[in-house]
A protein has these predicted regions:
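Short, polar/flexible loop-turn hinges at active-site or ligand-entry regions and domain interfaces
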Residues: 42-47, 99-104, 150-158
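A short, basic-hydrophobic beta/loop patch
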Residues: 64-81, 86-138, 159
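Hydrophobic transmembrane signal anchors and adjacent membrane-proximal interface regions, especially
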Residues: 5-7, 109-111, 188
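Alpha-helix initiation and N-capping motif
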Residues: 7-10, 33, 54-55, 89, ...
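Polar low-complexity intrinsically disordered regions enriched in Ser/Thr and small residues
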Residues: 19, 29-35, 101, 109, ...
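Solvent-exposed functional surfaces
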Residues: 72, 97, 118-260
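N-terminal leader or domain-start segments enriched in small/polar residues
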Residues: 1-80, 91, 97-100, 127-128
């Protein structure tokens, strides 16, 4: 794998920044040439806990603290994908497009209401990025290594990275949207959160009889998730057909095994 060091400003990185409220993820930066959350990346987490972490990113920039290195993968067609730094870049992009406020002198300020010197400070802050080029296996292995720090990748997030493709993309769209109205119902029976892939992991566990990795490997290039979705819904509907009420003790039971 080959790497080259590149310097960008926050303004350059955030040019053309696009954020999907539906999928809770940053889509593009660098005027559309940078894919911020490719298939193998985890969901955006810094907006959780009232946005504590994304505010901390802006605070670091204002205080001129280093944000750390970024790593981009250069694909065969010359486009860039974020390998490491997705949470930081999305936080910067969300702030620079007015998605949240930063407290300055006890006053909430969005980017357009900051004093001009502070706004320029943010826009002109330099970010160091390594551009990586290599085979898919090299890129995926490097992704796992550089993501050891920070918010630890859980086993399902790692499998999503290893077996990224149309199947994982469709499965994440179905089971990993924390704003989906069905999440509350699922959460009565499943422990964890949609954002950290816990519901997807459980759905895969149920349909594969616990052989999640084998199932993901077999279906990696499938363009639909009908079997996965239908089996999950069958289990949920079965639970609801048996119990008239939802009890706290029902959360986290091995429903897939009980159904089978």
């Amino acid at each position: 794998m080959e790497t080259t060091l590149q310097i960008y400003t926050v303004k350059q990185i955030c040019e053309g920044f696009t954020y999907s409220e539906t999928d809770n993820k940053g889509l593009y930066g660098l005027a559309g040439t940078l894919t911020i959350q490719p298939e193998y990346q985890r969901n955006y987490l810094y907006s959780e806990n009232n946005g504590k972490n994304e505010v901390a990113v802006i605070d670091s920039v204002i205080k001129k603290y280093p944000l750390g290195l970024l790593y981009f993968n250069k694909t065969k067609d010359g486009r860039l994908e974020v390998l490491d730094g997705q949470q930081r870049i999305t936080s910067l992009g969300r702030y620079c497009t007015g998605k949240f406020s930063y407290m300055l002198n006890d006053r909430p300020c969005k980017i357009f209401s900051l004093p001009e010197d502070k706004r320029k400070l943010i826009e002109e802050t330099k970010l160091l990025a390594y551009i990586c080029e290599g085979e898919e296996s090299e890129i995926k292995e490097w992704f796992k290594i550089i993501n050891i720090g920070g918010v630890k990748i859980n086993p399902q997030e790692e499998l999503n990275a290893v077996y990224s493709g149309p199947f994982v993309s469709a499965a994440r769209h179905e089971f990993s949207n924390k704003d989906d109205s069905r999440v509350q119902k699922w959460g009565a029976y499943i422990t964890g959160s949609a954002n950290r892939q816990d519901f997807l992991q459980e759905a895969l566990k149920w349909v594969s009889n616990g052989n999640i990795e084998d199932y993901m490997q077999e279906h990696r290039w499938d363009t639909n998730i009908n079997e996965l979705k239908n089996h999950f819904n069958d289990v949920i509907n079965w639970i609801e057909s048996i119990f008239d009420e939802v009890y706290p003790q029902m959360k986290g039971l091995k429903w897939g095994e009980l159904y089978d």
